[in-house]
Amino acid sequence: MSVIPWPLKPMSPPTPSGRAQHGAAVASASAAPAGHRGRAPAAPEATAGPDDTAAMAAALMQSRQTILPKRLGAPGPNVAELAAILEAAAHAPDHGQLQPWRFVLVPDTARTLLADVFALALQERDPEATPEQIEQAREKAYRSPVLLLAVVDSARGDADIDLAERLVSAGCAIQNMLLMATAQGFGSALTSGKALKAASLRALFRLGCDEQALCFVSIGTVVSRKGARVRPAASSYVSTLDEHRGILPGF
């Protein structure tokens, strides 16, 4: 079911020939057709050393891309796969071990409630919204087999740990989940929107006064996808503090 072997199991350092064989297996998995969820070629039995582990991690991160909810269909993760995705969040950095974030699963049986909230939020923002626009807002609640709301708490635990750190932790937790979903062969996306701040949505999800709805996480089988976007080079977003010349571009 996995696109690449997972979890990783580091073993003894590989021989040059073993490394080449494993690299070919990762390349083959990365080149699989869009939406393919077949089992990847088996990795060599003998070795999976540090170099191979890094290559597999790189292949996983580089294969993750945003697949809009309208491009995600059934089947979604089964119970065991969803549990693995959710458990991945627990491995995020968390200063003070506050666990300042949580996730609310929105099953199919509750999508109508969310659709009603989306429609109401639109009408509150735009009293002149057309029936077609209202229906489009409602329809968003039914996309993707798995839908989760990410929630962050600005006050839980140590008050000296500010919101910025809590948001970083939540972002890392979400990225862990997206990477696990990618490793399982699923597509995923984060979505937001003005409805996240609506009183009706806060009431539906019973958010506390110090909590905010961060984003929705959608997961499912890729039905269609756009081409992968070109990622920026590290040199475009990294600079170096030089003791004599100040901040210099690159690293």
Q: What are these model-predicted stretches?
A:
Residues 143-149:
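A structural motif
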Residues 108-113, 119-120, 154-156, 199, ...:
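Short, charged/polar surface micro-motifs in flexible loops or helix N-caps
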Residues 227-251:
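Phosphate/diphosphate-binding glycine-rich loops and adjacent basic-rich segments that engage nucleotide
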Residues 138-140, 204-230:
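A glycine-rich helix N-cap at a beta->alpha junction
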Residues 2-143, 250-251:
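N-terminal amphipathic, basic helical "cap/leader" segment at the start of enzyme domains
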Residues 68, 154-159, 242-251:
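Helix-biased detector of long, well-ordered alpha-helical tracts
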Residues 89, 148, 154-203:
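Small-aliphatic-rich amphipathic alpha-helix that forms the alpha element of a beta-alpha
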